[in-house]
UniProtKB/Swiss-Prot annotation:
Catalytic activity: orotidine 5'-phosphate + H(+) = UMP + CO2
SUPFAM superfamilies (UniProt xref): Ribulose-phoshate binding barrel
Enzyme type, top EC level: lyase
Protein's name according to its UniProt entry: Orotidine 5'-phosphate decarboxylase
Amino acid sequence: MKEERPIIALDFSSFEETKAFLDLFPAEEKLYVKIGMELYYAQGPDIVRYIKSLGHNVFLDLKLHDIPNTVRAAMAVLKELDIDMATVHAAGGVEMLKAAREGLGQGPTLIAVTQLTSTSEDQMRGDQNIQTSLLESVLHYSKGAAKAQLDGVVCSAQEVEAIKAVTPTGFNCLTPGIRPKGSNIGDQKRVMTPNQARRIGSDYIVVGRPITQAKDPVATYQAIKAEWAG
């Protein structure tokens, strides 16, 4: 599948900032937004309930990584928030991924984080003591996620084609680190433009600061959406 809307990363910590940003958009514009650790830990489940009450889709990106029983129970709780997508960390192993699927059920999309887009190959080898290539690590995690019946993975757009080649048809690739041409890449090491991500086969893209910190967030969002749609 291909989600037509870019997912907006709500890189805020307060309810007021979040509401002010969402209020910029007309009520009929239904967004797909990402709630990460900063916003969720600051505001808790109520921020999810508020955004869902506006009719937006919610991707809750908490990257759960714990023993299978704990992850299963946590996902069952998150399911009650009517989220549309959630993440777990692939490094937790296939049994943990299966437990996450059991807890969340078959409704929401469940994807696994492979290697963060802020991670370079040298960092992976030095910090994680993984001595394969970065791509081989990502493919290993992706195959584990597919085995556990997850819906896809978070990955760099540069890895999408290789992941699609080793996973079942319909396995989704969500790519963060998307930056419009000419924008600051921030702390991302592996980035692409929306157009490049579309052409290479990404199913979802996540864009944060280029939209949330833009002088005109609505116009910037619409431009990125148009570029993503092709």
